[in-house]
Amino acid sequence: MSASAVNVTPGRNVVVVGTQWGDEGKGKIVDWLTDHAQGVVRFQGGHNAGHTLIIGGKKTILRLIPSGIMREGVACYIGNGVVLSPEALFKEIGELEEAGVNVRDRLFISEATTLILPYHIAIDQAREARKGAGKIGTTGRGIGPAYEDKVGRRALRVQDLFDAKTFADRLRENLDFHNFVLTQYLGGAAVDFQATLDTMLGYADRLKPMVADVSRRLYDANNAGQNLLFEGAQGTLLDIDHGTYPFVTSSNCVAGAASAGAGVGPQKLNYILGITKAYCTRVGSGPFPSELYDADNPQRQDQVGVTLANVGKEFGSVTGRPRRTGWLDAAALRRSIQINGVSGLCMTKLDVLDGLDEVKLCVGYKIDGKDADILPRGAADVARCEPVYETFAGWKESTVGIKTWEALPANAQAYLTRVQEVAGVPVDMVSTGPDRDETILLRHPFKV
């Protein structure tokens, strides 16, 4: 190694994670931060969560490809912690290329990434149908079953596509197992071996130029002075271990997953940015202590919650499902900060609160008559939480597009200051609109 290489200062690495139940606005913030990064990394999840970007008034939804793809010259990485649907990937690539975005020269996919196959989707959908009213509310895209295969050491990975015979042998073995479950337990139809084999092997030549040793590339890039941005999907309260289990996703969504899911040592992660909306939302089933509105629940029709849903356009970017809405839960936020080791917060959608007469903040709970200041573990205990609120005067002035703290209404400043006090970490960024430029910066994650 040359002396000059030894003397290069390593780049900074920032991890962006959601602190709620997903849909916090991570995509916009990742896109904004990419101005200071040379690489963006997806490290978990699949195409079950969409990151929405508004750039120059144009809306783009990315499900698999890192948000950095919208910035020319930025390398994008899909790590080993992701579960990959080749069909969804090439659909997304096609949409981006039609819009004039160069993808294939800048996208690197770990050879160890788990594949989503047709039988994963069939099982996911059949399982939800069988559960009926007790369903978790998955997107039906095969994410969970693919992770189950990974943990069960049955998974087929990207690198397996390049050995057709071995792939066929392992596929047949997997189908023996999964078709039994589909037909004998879930009451579904069997998945055809030959059709699945032909479809999957048909992706091999198209994928191969993008397949790489992502862990090594990230190590070398960072040591050469490049800044890297790790882009989480979903949110901490959906984490398979730390979320409101069993109403969770099938992967680890916390900051620590960036290390395992991309093959990067934990000491390389310099700053953890926790994204929180100025209120809370949740999609699908599961407890939600500060809930105000649920389109499917006649008992949850509070008018403020309806306003939050309508003004905030709270509909899933992938599924289109209406999101449940509620006040910001700072006790749940404390749990997320603890688990992730959050360095600073970014509050998004502050502008959605504009015009409300009052704004409430959940600062703790009553659980069976006892005080609690942090979200408990597990859905059953969370369901017993009765929120304890602090109430703030609202603000009538518009915060849309504001770019400095001083320009915010005094009551909005008071609300943000209290969130910061209760959370115990600074609010370093505030988003005041969907466009990348509608952002207040108080401390820069790459420069702390």
Swiss-Prot record:
Purpose of the protein: Plays an important role in the de novo pathway of purine nucleotide biosynthesis. Catalyzes the first committed step in the biosynthesis of AMP from IMP.
Residues annotated to bind IMP: 23-26, 48-51, 139, 153, 234, 249, 321
Localization of this protein: Cytoplasm
InterPro entries documented for this protein: Adenylosuccin_syn_GTP-bd (IPR018220), Adenylosuccin_syn_Lys_AS (IPR033128), Adenylosuccinate_synth_dom1 (IPR042109), Adenylosuccinate_synth_dom2 (IPR042110), Adenylosuccinate_synth_dom3 (IPR042111), Adenylosuccinate_synthetase (IPR001114), P-loop_NTPase (IPR027417)
Magnesium among keywords: yes
Protein residues bound to Mg(2+): 23, 50
Associated pathway: Purine metabolism; AMP biosynthesis via de novo pathway; AMP from IMP: step 1/2
GO cellular component, one term: cytoplasm
Gene name tied to this protein: purA1
Protein name per the record: Adenylosuccinate synthetase 1
Database matches in CDD domains: AdSS
Keyword tags: Cytoplasm, GTP-binding, Ligase, Magnesium, Metal-binding, Nucleotide-binding, Purine biosynthesis
Residues the entry annotates as binding substrate: 317-323
